[in-house]
């Protein structure tokens, strides 16, 4: 063993250290802090060099090399921070962090989230001149606001800005290729990514507005997932005022957007309090009126039997009818339907019971929070729908019938009709307090041209508020502000009864009648009433906001449409007519005031609204604090895209806004902002008139070709095998092509075996030829050499060679002298000349006798060329390529043919072969040629097909030929020798068979082994787990009272009878008991089981007596 082998076993670790390493146990000398400095060793115990650095598993990712984006290194040394506005500390800090992390920014409304995004976008345009910067907003109005803010704050040139809001634009690919900054919606980006119009590798910055929408399958998530598949070297900046109402929601946003850092500020944060305007929050708790209490009592009395039935069936737990909650009932219904253990009939009975409770829960909520009018509009529709269906036998729900036909229900509806008929009646005390607050507010702020927004959840409630203010308020100009959807169709008794009687004709006529009456009704309705029925599209919403800003309306009664996403303007008073359990909605409502001047918020509470509001806000503040402290959430990891050697230094600078950007900044209309920016985009920074833009847009554009963003140099689409082979051939070198061409030529059936042999012997020449640049040069060189040979040698060279062959007794057929043209790839036509005087003529088979006459002269254009004293290469013709007939399948010879081939290798004295003393090369060539000629002649004389002929070198030599030769010579093969070891071995070598003898006691266990086996498989039982049986022959045995009877095993029939007998023995005297047992022992028979049973039966009978 050498010194290197010795060093393997000279490990400096002891056994305990090795054990700790195997089980990954830290040693006592090392601490947890030094775990990163562990030495890595290979299988031989050697320390691995230091280039193997341990990756910190806590990171969960590998840091990648610098970004693939093109960088402007001159600008990378600094970043610009605009001083056009007040420099705020929190904005300055957030901008710096956005350069290095995927950032989620949560700021209250009005604190400059857009300024942060604009500053980051400005610097990314300086650093990454070819990168794509995308600003996404969920709605078109928000996109217009961001265009105005970004172009007006940072002065990004409009020539580099693109606005993509129309999905049907034909020149989208040209816009994506020519621009760098894009303002669009996430749906447009998602469609263009999937269509292959955008190259995701070019995206360097993604700004997401209203990031709290990044949940579920929203387009924001799909865009980020798609880009991340091809590009991880880009930054994400997510902006929102309220990330989520719970920890799970915040974590979902972080996971979907790959957020690596969160920046959260609240109104109580130290660094933003000095920038916050004063916002006064006033709470008013309203008690229900007498009318509302009476209606609640009557409704509770009517629903009590249904509620009791639900409690008995344990499908709803609440027993107080006045506290029925519709949301809890819906949750119970869903759990009921998902329960597979309940029979279907019972399941649907319980479901219909819960549906009745759901209607009552919704009615109570409307009555307690919104008033009698909202309650009546909802409950009257439900009552009318069921009663008509039940009377027409469309419904057979007896439980619902007992509720809707209850006496109190009729009293409730009649009382509501009576109250609503009064024009001065206000459905809820909230309305009275609201109108008084509005009157006082406008009186105090009459000179300030103030605005008010009132938020409510239901459209009916919004219309009720507008109607009440218009009737009672003075100098109050309210209008409803709702979404685009139409009012839900109410139950129409006439349409329902006519349905199915006369088919669709009646329905169409009724619909046409309603449409004809619509213009007459619209003239009598107010603008708010008409909007409540038809809904408000974006055009109506925009017109209303304009009128609100101008002062035509000073009060907007809005649903959730006004909570976010619209630039409504400065509002001095926010009234929350109702409150929700969502803190996001509450914060967005209150954030509409106090932006540029002080504001006020009025919260109106009724019932349990105040407790829900406090609970929601307290939970939100708790979550915000933990997010700011970095707890309760798990952040993602992101790689740097700015090289580590660069750390940009701030350069505070006043940004000069270009003229075209000033025009966008001064515009208030959102559609006009988009039109101006689009015109600059289409004309590279030059604004044009509408007529020119229309004429230009009408020009036909090229069809967009879909791009597949695969790895570089990847061919897409379907391809046949031929095209793939051709492409592979085009990538090969000339030498590889020549080698492959020669290999294919060998496989062609049109080639003769002698040509293959000669070319195989001329491999050095082929290697030199493969180094030629192309085949044309080779042909030119060959022709030049042929010309030289023709000039140096005489014209009778072929005749001289034939004379020499005659003298030596060697002659070759015509195929060796001149190869006729064949189908297939161009081949060289070699010639062979044996310039050696042999002792005797070489023998051939009978089918091919020696040719002693003159051989046919070669063609005139063929010259002789000798490269060695044995072989003379032939002239090569550069003939044009011809199509081949393809490859022929070769068949392997049978065993008989292989035997014959094997015998042909052995040269015997009685054969036609004679030993010739020549050199090794000459002998190998000669033997090969003779064997091939013999084989060819044999095939010519036989009836077998030419396909049976194949080159000997192509046959795999598995040693069978030698075995068969031994068999033919009456000799034992090695296999037979192994089966017959007693026979005398040849060459004094015999195979030894492994012998093994077994001792007589082999496989029998001794006592020690038996004990070990027993103790391995059996263990002692705990005394508490033992089961003891009573022995009737042992009179000294006492019952074990400590035994736990939980594991008792049942007795057999004989044992049970013995135990019964033992009770009798214990009751008699000792002498009598001994006699009975003695009798049993004397008469016990080991073979007669029936006799023993008889004795036991006698003892038992005697004991019973």
From Swiss-Prot:
Keywords: ATP-binding, DNA damage, DNA repair, DNA-binding, Helicase, Hydrolase, Nucleotide-binding, Nucleus
InterPro entries in the record: FANCM/Mph1-like_ID, FANCM_DEXDc, Helicase/UvrB_N, Helicase_ATP-bd, Helicase_C-like, P-loop_NTPase
Compartmental location: Nucleus
Main location per the UniProt record: nucleus
Enzyme Commission numbers on file: 3.6.4.12
Residue span, Helicase ATP-binding domain: 94-261
MF (Gene Ontology): 3'-5' DNA helicase activity; ATP binding; ATP hydrolysis activity; four-way junction DNA binding; four-way junction helicase activity
Skewed-composition ranges (Low complexity): 788-799
Role noted for this protein: ATP-dependent DNA helicase involved in DNA damage repair by homologous recombination and in genome maintenance. Capable of unwinding D-loops. Plays a role in limiting crossover recombinants during mitotic DNA double-strand break (DSB) repair. Component of a FANCM-MHF complex which promotes gene conversion at blocked replication forks, probably by reversal of the stalled fork.
Name of the protein described by the UniProt record: ATP-dependent DNA helicase MPH1
Species assigned in the record: Debaryomyces hansenii (strain ATCC 36239 / CBS 767 / BCRC 21394 / JCM 1990 / NBRC 0083 / IGC 2968) (Yeast)
